[in-house]
Amino acid sequence: MIPDKVKVAGIEYRVQEVEDMDRQFDHLGLILYTKGVIKLDKNLSQDRKEQVFIHELLHGCFYEAGIEEQDEDIINRVSIVLYQVLKDNKLHFGKIETS
């Protein structure tokens, strides 16, 4: 499940699902560091959306760690593996809210 907001190194990023990201920005996701926003293409499958979220989250982690020049290939590779590790092992942290 993708949260509405996420903190990276104490900085809050709002997560927004946007129509036609691919057509507007030629990306499936996008992080706006100065605005504190992660945008995801609303029309993606849930698995792909989660994978793209992890990808953008890693960009945020690198940026907040002071690494402004990021190798997109490394982010892609690590995000795919990290997403699969989290999913396959059903890993989550913090309190699970039940309704």
Regions found by a protein language model. Name each.
Residues 1-48, 64-99:
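Metalloprotease/metallohydrolase-associated module, dominated by Zn2+-dependent proteases
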Residues 51-63:
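Active-site recognition of the HExxH zinc-binding catalytic motif
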